[in-house]
Amino acid sequence: PCPSCVPNNVLGRANMTTASRKSIAICGACGCDKIVIHPCFSGDPTAPLDPEEEWNINIDFYSSFIPTLKASGVKCCLENMFITDKKGKSYGAICSDITETCRYIDTLNEIAGETLFGFCLDTGHLLMAGHDITFAIQKLGERLIALHVHDNDGYHDDHNAPYLGGIQNWNRFFLGLRAIGYKGDMNMETGNAVGRVPDALIPSTLRLLADTANYFRDVVLADETV
C-alpha cells in the first residue's frame, strides 16, 4: 500500500499496517524474499514531524512486522524518500540521510535478533534530494539489498528510463555497486517510460528497458574499471 503509513491518523495507520502485513505474507507465499515498505513521514514540508517522534513512529511501525517477516521468510526494505514544497522545490525526506538510514536498519535488526531489514535505494528519489549516489551506496554497504532504478528531471518523480533524465553520470552508480560487491536485482522502476508511448512502441520500449538493465548488470559485474 502507498502511503504505507499515515502518521497523524490512528485508523489510517492501523489499516496500512494490516495491509502491509498481508503484503508480507503474500510475498512469502509467492516465493519473493524481499518487500519494500515506505517509511512514515509527514509529507507536508510546512508541518514535518519532530525528529524524535518520527524515529519512534518508524521503529514501532517496522518492529510490528517482525513476527510476520520471520514466519514468511521475507526481508523488509526501507526506502529513501523526498518531499516537494508548494514552489516545486524537492528536498530529501526520511531515509535520505544515509547515516540515519543505517541507524534505522541496524536498530531494527538488533530488535529482531537477526537480519530482517535492509534497504532499497531509489535512484530517482536520491536525485531529487540532491545526494551523491556513490557515497550513499558505499555508506549502506551490505545493508543495500534492493534497487529502484529510474531517472527524472530532478523536480518530478517521473520514473523514466535511465539516460532520459537528470542522472547524467550513471558511472557513479556503477562505481558504488562495484565497491560493495552488490549482487542483488537490478529492478527498473520505469512504468512511465512505457505509459507515455503509443501502444505500438510498447514492445520496443520494454526491450530498451531490458537491454538497459542487462547493460547495467554487465557493467557492475565486469572485471574492468568503469
Labelled PLM ranges:
Residues 1-60, 191-193:
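Structural motif corresponding to the early beta-alpha repeats
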Residues 2-4, 39-43, 80-84, 123-125, ...:
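Active-site-proximal loop/turn and secondary-structure-junction residues that shape catalytic pockets
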Residues 17, 21-25, 31-33, 49, ...:
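Histidine-acidic metal/acid-base catalytic patches
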Residues 40-51, 78-93, 196-197:
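Active-site-proximal beta-alpha loop/turn segments in soluble metabolic enzymes
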Residues 54-57, 93-97:
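Short, contiguous, pocket-lining structural segments
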Residues 73-77:
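Conserved Rossmann-fold SDR core element
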